Each structure stands twice: as C-alpha cells, then as structure tokens.
A protein has these predicted regions:
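Hydrophobic/aromatic residues in alpha-helical transmembrane segments
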Residues: 1, 13, 85-86, 129, ...
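Helix-loop-helix units of permease transmembrane domains in multi-pass membrane transporters
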Residues: 3-35
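Helix-loop interface residues and adjacent transmembrane-helix termini in multi-pass membrane transporters
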Residues: 7, 20, 93-94, 160
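Membrane-interfacial segments
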Residues: 8, 12, 52-60, 94, ...
Length: 172
C-alpha cells in the first residue's frame, strides 16, 4: 500500500500515462511486480524458520520436509496474494499514501481479529485466505480445492474491482 500509494501521491502513474503506456500495461506491470515482491518478502520468515528448525531438531523424512515446504510456499503465494490485493484496491480508491496505508492496516487488522475471535466463537472463517493457509499446512494432501477456490475468488474479485477503479482514475 505504501509504495503504490506513493506512486499515486507523487504522480508517477500520471507520468507513465503521459509517456504513452496504456492503463492495461501499467496496471498489469504494477500488479505483477508488487505481488512478486510481496510474496518474496512474505516467504523469507517462514522459510528461514524452517531452515533454523531443521538445523536445531533435524528431520526424520527429508522428502516430507521438502513436500511440506513446497506446499506451504505455493499456497502461501496464492492466499497471501489475495490478502495483499486488498492494499492494491484501497490504493486505487484513495490514491493517497497515508490514507491507503492506514485504511489497509485497519482492514487487515480487522480481518485478523475476526479470524482469531471467529475461530474461538465458532463463526464462519473458511472464506478467509489466512484461515485457508492454516488448513493447508495442517493437511497431508497437496491438492486443496477449497483453498484454491478461496484464493482465486478473493484475487479475482479484488483485481477486477481494482482494475475498474484504476480505469476510472483521472490521470493527466
């Protein structure tokens, strides 16, 4: 939210439009580059934690260890991207770095609170991508259709809404 908000605030996107790039090119490049950067940053901590614990406790089955790491990486990228796209949507609507960062933080904090208390109070939490990550890493099977569906629905809706708003933004 911070970086994309700065691009709106500092009118970087306006310069890209003025340079002759289409909105589709700009939007697609922003989404792809930010999702790659976000997922790389989001995976550093879990992967380093696995390596640290591997060194400390060892692993009984190396194949299963790497199977679980690959599964966690793939599903984390899909489901964390769905959460990160909230920031993209908010930035497209607010077009201000401070407002977008604040609103995004509040929304994600609210979703985290709902996940924590929702699980305790037995509220429906299966629609949350963060909950699906928890389910996927605790299951033995690799293919988790519900997690894939949740990630794709969240991502699809958020990208569509972001694109619609991005097309309506006034760039001069």
């Amino acid at each position: 939210a911070l970086i994309l908000g700065q691009e709106f605030s500092k009118r970087t996107i306006n310069l890209e439009v003025s340079a002759g790039h289409s909105r589709k090119q700009i939007f697609t490049s922003k989404i792809i580059s930010y999702l790659i950067a976000f997922n790389l940053m989001a995976l550093v901590y879990p992967v380093s934690g696995c390596i640290r614990e591997f060194g400390r406790f060892g692993v009984a089955d190396v194949g299963m260890f790497f199977y679980n790491i690959i599964k966690a990486i793939i599903y984390s990228c899909l489901l964390n991207s769905a959460i990160f796209l909230i920031a993209i949507l908010i930035c497209c609507y607010l077009q201000d770095v401070v407002k977008a960062t604040s609103v995004t933080a509040i929304i994600i904090f609210g979703l985290s609170l709902y996940l924590g208390y929702g699980m305790m109070l037995r509220l429906p939490v299966g629609f949350l991508p963060t909950y699906q990550i928890r389910i996927v890493v605790s299951m033995k099977t690799f293919f988790q259709p519900i997690a894939i569906l949740v990630g794709c629905i969240w991502s699809g809706i958020l990208v569509l809404l972001s694109w619609i708003k991005f097309c309506k933004c006034d760039f001069k």
